[in-house]
Swiss-Prot record:
PROSITE patterns: S5A_REDUCTASE
Protein's name according to its UniProt entry: Polyprenal reductase
GO molecular function: polyprenal reductase activity; polyprenol reductase activity
Principal subcellular localisation of the protein: endoplasmic reticulum
Domain of life: Eukaryota
Reactions listed under catalytic activity: a di-trans,poly-cis-dolichal + NADP(+) = a di-trans,poly-cis-polyprenal + NADPH + H(+)
Function: Plays a key role in early steps of protein N-linked glycosylation by being involved in the conversion of polyprenol into dolichol. Acts as a polyprenal reductase that mediates the reduction of polyprenal into dolichal in a NADP-dependent mechanism. Dolichols are required for the synthesis of dolichol-linked monosaccharides and the oligosaccharide precursor used for N-glycosylation.
Family: Belongs to the steroid 5-alpha reductase family. Polyprenal reductase subfamily.
Cellular compartments annotated: Endoplasmic reticulum membrane
Pathway the protein contributes to: Protein modification; protein glycosylation
GO process annotations (BP): dolichol biosynthetic process; dolichol metabolic process; dolichol-linked oligosaccharide biosynthetic process; polyprenol catabolic process
Keyword presence, Endoplasmic reticulum: yes
């Protein structure tokens, strides 16, 4: 029991636990009693939902363009490259990392036991995340149409930290990084059928989310793909007939499918918890915004999960 409590006290689990709890409390205030503390909704929302909040000069001063989302993915790709290179190098040179660096990495996650992630699984997971992050970077640059909406520095910082922590958490729990083994190897035979199924599901969810991103962008584009306006509109067709935010739903599915690939990863469980709560509250806040903004918004639509939530 004490060992388990110590694991939570490690840097990454503790950060994710505190962040998730703070996010949940802030979003509850925003949804249930936004007028109790006007600063909380201003810090919790961004984009179109933030435009609905009363002006807050402090938050406005520390806000950045929403189109800076691309920084999340650019920094995430760089971190992924470093992590992939590190894991690959350790396979052929166990002494690739300096002992001081290994000690620092060990403090980020559980250090009392041998990390359960094999190099084969680690490389597969990091490659899958690279696919996801590269796709999101492409969409933010070439697909999405951003208005003049902004997000505060709190969202910006949390987003950047998230895409740095995601690959690092997997690397830290890989054999050879936080533990020394006499011999490491990579083999396709190390990947189970369940892990391959998770990889396929991960790809399908990414493809579906990409289609949804294009569908959202098309509400602001004309027949020839030229931007015709920056106003917010209502999407119809497919998943949008069931929920207001299917792209958030598939974001959750992407992270859950990756869990099939790395089921023994410890810190990743905290990441899933953070993503699920973040996307759920974001969907509820967005869903509420649609109903307040468009009087004829379809009442049969749910926020995130068809027929349920």
């Amino acid at each position: 029991m004490l060992d388990r409590l110590w694991e939570v006290r490690q840097a990454l689990p503790l950060y994710l636990l505190v962040s998730t709890l703070g996010l949940a409390i802030s979003c509850c205030f925003t949804l249930i009693c936004p007028h109790v503390c006007r600063l909380i909704p201003a810090l919790t929302t961004y984009g179109k939902a933030a435009d609905q909040q009363e002006d807050n000069s402090l938050v406005e001063k520390i806000s950045v363009p929403k189109k800076w989302f691309k920084h999340f993915y650019a920094i995430g790709l760089l971190t992924l490259f470093i992590c992939l290179h590190t894991v690959h190098s350790l396979i052929y040179n166990p002494n690739y990392l300096h002992p001081v660096v290994l000690k620092i990495l060990a403090t980020l996650t559980r250090s009392y036991s041998i990390p359960p992630i094999t190099p084969s699984t680690s490389i597969l997971a990091l490659l899958l995340i690279s696919l996801h992050v590269a796709r999101r970077l492409y969409e933010t640059i070439f697909v999405s149409v951003y208005s003049d909406s902004r997000m505060n520095l709190f969202h910006y910082a949390v987003g950047i930290v998230h895409y740095i922590i995601l690959p690092i958490s997997i690397m830290c729990e890989t054999q050879g990084v936080a533990s020394k083994l006499p011999q490491l190897h990579v083999s396709i035979d190390d990947i189970s059928l369940t892990q391959w199924a998770g990889a396929v599901l991960f790809w399908i969810c990414n493809w579906k989310q990409h289609q949804l991103a294009e569908q959202i962008a098309n509400t602001r584009k004309g027949p020839r793909g030229l931007i015709r306006n920056y106003a917010y509109g209502i999407c119809f067709g497919g998943w949008f007939n069931l929920v207001s935010c299917p792209h958030f739903l598939f974001e959750i599915c992407i992270y859950l499918s990756l869990f099939l690939v790395i089921p023994d990863a410890y810190v990743y469980r905290f990441i899933i918890m953070f993503v699920c709560i973040n996307q759920t509250f974001a969907a509820l806040i967005t869903h509420s915004w649609y109903h307040k903004t468009f009087p004829k918004y379809p009442k049969s639509r749910k926020a995130l999960i068809p027929y349920v939530l």
